[in-house]
Amino acid sequence: MTKKKYYISRYIVTFISAGLAAVIPLVFNLMVVMCFLPWGTPIRATGLYPVVTGNVFENVFYNYPLLYVIIYLIYTFVEFGLLSCICLTCVYIEDNWFAVTLTPFILYFSEHVFLTIGLGLKHMSLLGLANMYNVYINNINILIIQLAGLFVVNMLFFLRVRGDVL
């Protein structure tokens, strides 16, 4: 196995395992809730749902709720997969495995505290945007920029790989 294939497989395994660690509890929760509550098309007039006018995929939520759930799970899978792969980049900066393991959480939570408490920008926090019903059409560009930033940080791992010896 070449060094390039090894690091690519390491990245893919980390991405998939983190995405599954985020999505499996959501799927289990959905199945448990479906055992007790009826599944049906949500009615906008009741006002019982967090998806309101201006949310991304609001029409999908009210017309095709299962498709909305699938989109929500894919979004969560990708977001937390990218977030956890930051560990692979930070392994070159820090030698302590415990600190490397905590790096995604520390960055995720400190970004939330800095933006919400420090700057008062609640709509820009990745933690707040993790719930898709908090993503509005007018701030979708903020989410795309943050996900692109996570992707760029993850790609730094592959830049460092070129000079590494297996």
Descriptions of predicted regions:
Residues 89, 93, 148-166:
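Junction motif at the cytosolic side of a transmembrane helix
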Residues 21, 25, 29, 33, ...:
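Structural signal for membrane-spanning alpha-helices in multi-pass inner-membrane proteins
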Residues 37-51, 106-122:
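Juxtamembrane non-transmembrane "cap" segments at the membrane-aqueous interface
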Residues 1-11:
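Interfacial "coupling" helices/loops that link adjacent transmembrane helices in transporter permeases
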Residues 1, 85-94:
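Generic transmembrane alpha-helix motif of multi-pass integral membrane proteins
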Residues 112-135, 139-156:
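Extracytoplasmic/secretory soluble proteins
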Residues 97-111, 149-150:
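Central hydrophobic cores of alpha-helical transmembrane segments
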Residues 11-88, 127-146:
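Secretory targeting signals
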